[in-house]
């Protein structure tokens, strides 16, 4: 049964778990999650993070759209110390779809502006900038630039080809890699 997460207290969550006969451990003291952390020159204001999830809402050129920006601004307002951006393609032919984000020379300023907005939202709402991480991506055999399958592979793999076919013409050069 699916339902929205509407619980306001830990007690409500525990009661629901009992109702469903789900045995989960719960920590009464979660203060460690609020502790800052410094790792190799990066300051993380707390131990909370947003996992990457593709919105598939870029512009045709791969720039962050208003929907992309709004999603990440909202995540910054939520207070997580780390926001891990969704898969961002590094080359046009490596995009999983026409709506996957693409970072290149032409789009770089749009990403810079989005980063500034996200950081500003974090500072305004919580007093700190979240650490932003980019998940760089090449979709390989699942590439669909222009929303048409165009697999690119380093080598043949019989097992993977049962899911998405790719013949020798799809093999990229060592220079491409």
Where are these regions (language model features)?
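Non-globular sequence segments
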Residues: 129-131, 137-177
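Glycine-rich anion/phosphate-binding loops
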Residues: 56-77, 100-120, 126, 144-146, ...
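Conserved, mostly hydrophobic/aromatic
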Residues: 50, 75, 79, 134
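Short connector loops/turns at beta-strand edges and beta->alpha or beta->beta junctions
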Residues: 55, 81, 88-93, 156-161
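Short secondary-structure boundary/capping segments within folded domains
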Residues: 38-44, 73-75
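N-terminal glycine-rich anion-binding loops that anchor highly charged ligand groups
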Residues: 42-51, 81-87
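An N-cap/entry alpha-helix motif that binds or orients negatively charged groups
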Residues: 1-40, 55-63
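Glycine-rich, proline-tolerant flexible connector loops at the mouths of alpha/beta enzymes
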Residues: 82-109, 136-148
